[in-house]
């Protein structure tokens, strides 16, 4: 049964996050998805991001809305970018263009430890109405909503 890793800060659960999470569950099939959620300690420089527990609750609510059984996933705290993927046995890692370099680093570390590399599943960005990627930063700035719809005209 496949073990699939996916990770992120998940500040604003937007359509890009949805695509990543859905892909992870699709690949897992009868296996399990391990969702690494960035810890407060890792984000200590960015005070505009909600605390770990609030982000965790929103993530749990989102997965519950997907009607995924609790035994099919586990949320783990990420205290570093690689999390448990360098030590534990996983089969896949689902990444965005932003997190792809981390997956390459994880596989280099795994190779040095004599572990099999993870199969990297690359998920493209989801684009907003204006053709640029949906991101939590853009949502926080009030440019777009979580579905990529424009909220106001961009300041040129």
UniProtKB/Swiss-Prot annotation:
Keyword flag Nucleotide-binding: yes
Protein name in the entry: Phosphopantetheine adenylyltransferase
Family of the protein in this entry: Belongs to the eukaryotic CoaD family.
Gene: coaD
Species per Swiss-Prot/TrEMBL record: Methanosarcina acetivorans (strain ATCC 35395 / DSM 2834 / JCM 12185 / C2A)
Record EC number: 2.7.7.3
Pathway assigned in UniProt: Cofactor biosynthesis; coenzyme A biosynthesis
A biological process from GO: coenzyme A biosynthetic process
Signal peptide: none
InterPro entries in the cross-refs: Cyt_trans-like, PPAT_arch, Rossmann-like_a/b/a_fold
A single MF term (Gene Ontology): pantetheine-phosphate adenylyltransferase activity
NCBIfam families: cyt_tran_rel (TIGR00125), PRK00777.1 (NF001985)
Alphabetically ordered keywords of this record: ATP-binding, Coenzyme A biosynthesis, Cytoplasm, Nucleotide-binding, Nucleotidyltransferase, Transferase
GO CC annotations on file: cytoplasm
Pfam families: CTP_transf_like
Recorded catalytic activity of this chain's protein: (R)-4'-phosphopantetheine + ATP + H(+) = 3'-dephospho-CoA + diphosphate
Function: Reversibly transfers an adenylyl group from ATP to 4'-phosphopantetheine, yielding dephospho-CoA (dPCoA) and pyrophosphate.
Compartments (UniProt record): Cytoplasm
């Amino acid at each position: 049964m496949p073990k699939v890793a996916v990770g992120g800060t998940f500040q604003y659960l937007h359509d890009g996050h949805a695509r990543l999470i859905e892909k992870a569950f699709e690949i897992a099939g009868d296996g399990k998805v391990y969702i690494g959620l960035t810890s407060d300690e890792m984000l200590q420089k960015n005070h505009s991001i909600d605390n770990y527990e609030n982000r965790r609750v929103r993530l749990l609510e989102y997965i519950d809305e997907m009607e995924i059984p609790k035994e099919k996933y586990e949320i783990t705290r990420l205290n570093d970018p690689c999390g448990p993927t360098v030590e534990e046995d996983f089969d896949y890692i689902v990444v965005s263009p932003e997190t792809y370099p981390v997956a390459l680093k994880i596989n280099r570390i795994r190779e040095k430890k004599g572990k099999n590399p993870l199969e990297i599943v690359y998920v493209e960005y989801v684009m907003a109405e204006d053709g640029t990627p949906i991101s939590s930063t853009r949502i926080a700035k009030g440019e777009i909503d979580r579905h990529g719809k424009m909220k106001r005209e961009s300041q040129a």
